[in-house]
Amino acid sequence: MKILLIGGGARESAIAHALKKNEEVKLYTLMKNKNPGIARLSEEIKLAKETDLDAVKEFAEKVKPDLAVIGPEAPLGEGVVDLLEEMGISAVGPKKLAAQIETNKEFMRNLFKKYNIKGSLMYKAFEEYGEELESFIDELTEKGIKAVVKPVGLTGGKGVKVVGEQLKDNEEAKKYAKEIFETGLGGGKVLIEEKLEGVEFTLHGFVDGDTIKFTPFVQDHPHALEGDEGSITGGMGSYSCPDHKLPFMTEEDVKLAKEIMEETVKALKEEVGGYKGILYGQFMLTKEGPKIIEYNARFGDPEAMNLLAILKNDFLEVCEAIVNKKLKDIDVEFENKATVCKYVVPKGYPDNPVRGEPITVDEEAIKKTGAILHYASVNEDNGSLYMTGSRAVAVVGVADTIEEAERIAEEATKYIKGEVYHRSDIGKKELIKKRIEKMNELRR
């Protein structure tokens, strides 16, 4: 069984490991840099940009895969699934039109409005800076609501700025909106939303167009520094619990979050003829219940590493059920284990990361800790590893309790050396307690 994998980060490393648990699988990977972990699992690799559709086509023609799995969002936004399906290759991932749920934040908000999906919020999209934008932000200010400023298109998770975090006040939000128009960031259109107060969580679903099968809930940590300080990153690490929900969630929260995603899948069927692949909802749990911050059209990174580490099914079976519209016929099951994932990143990440610096990873020592290792933004050159500026290496602890999973992941970070840092507080009970207290406070 030949599988074409597109992408070369830690998320794709987790996908590769999950697929290779099936001995029939032969992996062929197209990625930007040589990820040593993925390269070892692959029969053949091609180094090319994941958005280079000509390179994808050429590699796919050569390999003739039975199935393709798309890791990152950028190729989905370029229409890589449309291309592969035209070649007769089934792909786990949405077509370009359906991928807009991630690649076009305005499309996502309008979908919620049109189909009256629960969990929406105040928003407005703008094509230029002017009086209309200013008066919408002023309206939020009058209501005592802080603004969130988002470029409408893709920015690799780094374009969103929030009043009270990266922006001082709503006046500064106007300046940032103006900057987006001037620089053309994320396509140069701007979405202004109300800031939600609460605790963030994520939920993934495997979708075949009609059926959605859910994974455990995961909590990501987007802030660069301990105690949830610093810049917003692609995610510094994440954890999941043995009971598959999060400690600050009620059963009602779980039910509502799943309903929102089910309604979204139905709306996408009406609007674009269906969505297949992985759907990843990023939620804010507010005192009114879960609300959607945004959707992604693929696995979260880091969350894929938590989820695929405890998936009981053969992942190939799940992928085949997605493309063959057979998800209703299978039970998707996960072990009742806790997982903690921690990223080791270059110093200065995300604002001014060191690049091209060597990093050493003692794989044997990490193996002895019991942690799972995934290489991310590194490049292997003549047997040495160099950081390319984004998150470098991830380690995952899996155990019966969060405490034990956290201890395993933390122990493993000691064996990764270089100009690096990580957040040692992810998965620690103090930080989780802070989340529980925040939710209790909001619910009063």
UniProtKB/Swiss-Prot annotation:
Residues bound to ATP: 140-202
Keywords from the named record: ATP-binding, Ligase, Magnesium, Manganese, Metal-binding, Nucleotide-binding, Purine biosynthesis
Q: Give the superkingdom in one word.
A: Archaea
Q: What does the record give under GO molecular function?
A: ATP binding; metal ion binding; phosphoribosylamine-glycine ligase activity
Query: Can you tell me which residues bind Mg(2+) 2?
Result: E294, N296
Q: Which reaction does it catalyse?
A: 5-phospho-beta-D-ribosylamine + glycine + ATP = N(1)-(5-phospho-beta-D-ribosyl)glycinamide + ADP + phosphate + H(+)
Q: Which GO terms describe its biological process?
A: 'de novo' IMP biosynthetic process; purine nucleobase biosynthetic process
Write down the InterPro entries for this protein, in alphabetical order: ATP-grasp (IPR011761), ATP_grasp_subdomain_1 (IPR013815), PreATP-grasp_dom_sf (IPR016185), PRibGlycinamid_synth_ATP-grasp (IPR020561), PRibGlycinamide_synth (IPR000115), PRibGlycinamide_synth_C-dom (IPR020560), PRibGlycinamide_synth_C_sf (IPR037123), PRibGlycinamide_synth_CS (IPR020559)
Residues annotated as binding Mg(2+) 1 are Q282, E294
| Residue ranges of domain ATP-grasp in the record | 109-324
Q: Which cofactor does it need?
A: Mg(2+); Mn(2+)
* UniProt keyword Metal-binding present: yes
Pathway named in the protein's UniProt entry? Purine metabolism; IMP biosynthesis via de novo pathway; N(1)-(5-phospho-D-ribosyl)glycinamide from 5-phospho-alpha-D-ribose 1-diphosphate: step 2/2
> Which HAMAP family does the record associate with it?
GARS
By sequence similarity, the record places it as follows: Belongs to the GARS family.
Its protein name is: Phosphoribosylamine--glycine ligase
| Species, as recorded | Methanocaldococcus jannaschii (strain ATCC 43067 / DSM 2661 / JAL-1 / JCM 10045 / NBRC 100440)
Which lineage ranks, top first, belong to the organism behind this chain? Archaea, Methanobacteriati, Methanobacteriota, Methanomada group, Methanococci
